[in-house]
């Protein structure tokens, strides 16, 4: 059993490090993890779940606004992307945040094609991050279920 726990912990560490090195996460995610303790062991998963729910709504709102060909409300899109950028920043979603900056620039210049293209990229990155973090949380659960402790990962 100790071997299994050690293997899971190693996978967890390697996977976590890869998320940072590939630019999916930044230091804000590390800060968020520091707020999690034994009294609230699911804190990060809960915050991230709320973030992803927020992402879905905001992306959907922006897609609807951009679907109004010839009558796009760039102010609405800009407001939504500003919210998404803030949420992304608060959970350490580095790639999503970076794409939001580009999308906001497209909104500010009323570049319709740029907005559509960037929104598609935001949607892809959000879905990719969601899948990767779900894998990370699943690894955490496996470690705990096997009787182990979640290792501290130094980035």
Curated annotation (Swiss-Prot):
The modification N-acetylmethionine is found at residue 1. GO terms for biological process: antipodal cell differentiation; cytokinin-activated signaling pathway; embryo sac egg cell differentiation; phosphorelay signal transduction system. The keyword Acetylation applies. Two-component system major event consists of a His-to-Asp phosphorelay between a sensor histidine kinase (HK) and a response regulator (RR). In plants, the His-to-Asp phosphorelay involves an additional intermediate named Histidine-containing phosphotransfer protein (HPt). This multistep phosphorelay consists of a His-Asp-His-Asp sequential transfer of a phosphate group between first a His and an Asp of the HK protein, followed by the transfer to a conserved His of the HPt protein and finally the transfer to an Asp in the receiver domain of the RR protein. Residues 40-147 form the HPt domain. Keywords: Acetylation, Cytokinin signaling pathway, Cytoplasm, Nucleus, Phosphoprotein, Stress response, Two-component regulatory system. It is found in: Cytoplasm, Cytosol; Nucleus. This is Histidine-containing phosphotransfer protein 3. The gene is AHP3.
